[in-house]
């Protein structure tokens, strides 16, 4: 007689999640277009805003950050033409911290130009020591 075993991982995780999503591409001439497709696939994770930062060796960093859905913002070929290069990272946002009214400064990825080069960063989750880090770094 066989006995049925319960599944090792129950199937109770079938709902959409309200979390951010990150997607990156490296080594493709139009990396930002691939990132836009990846963000579209992750759209259910973040529905408030999205952003893409790309880097081109000859043009440096370029970014686009917008409120709303990926399909409404990153399908415009004129906008995507402003995001050249073989490196790109994107983020879709679902806020769990910060103010209730969305502000563009909270839309990721973040990037900065420094004396030794630039950097772009996107993260998921809350930075629990954000206030202390802000005081220390700024």
Model-derived features with residue positions:
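N-terminal glutamine amidotransferase
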Residues: 1-131, 136
């Amino acid at each position: 007689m066989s006995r049925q075993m319960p599944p090792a991982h129950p199937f109770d995780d079938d709902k959409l999640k309200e979390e951010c999503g990150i997607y990156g591409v490296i080594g493709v001439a139009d990396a930002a277009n691939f990132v836009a497709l990846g963000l579209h696939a992750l759209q259910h994770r973040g529905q408030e805003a999205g952003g893409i930062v790309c880097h081109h060796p000859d043009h440096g960093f370029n970014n686009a950050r917008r409120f709303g859905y990926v399909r409404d913002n990153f399908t415009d070929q004129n906008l995507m033409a402003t995001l050249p290069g073989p490196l790109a990272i994107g983020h879709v946002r679902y806020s769990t911290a910060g103010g209730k009214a969305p502000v563009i400064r909270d839309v990721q990825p973040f990037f900065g130009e420094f004396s030794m080069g630039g950097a772009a960063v996107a993260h998921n989750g809350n930075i629990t020591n954000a206030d202390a880090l802000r005081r220390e770094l700024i």
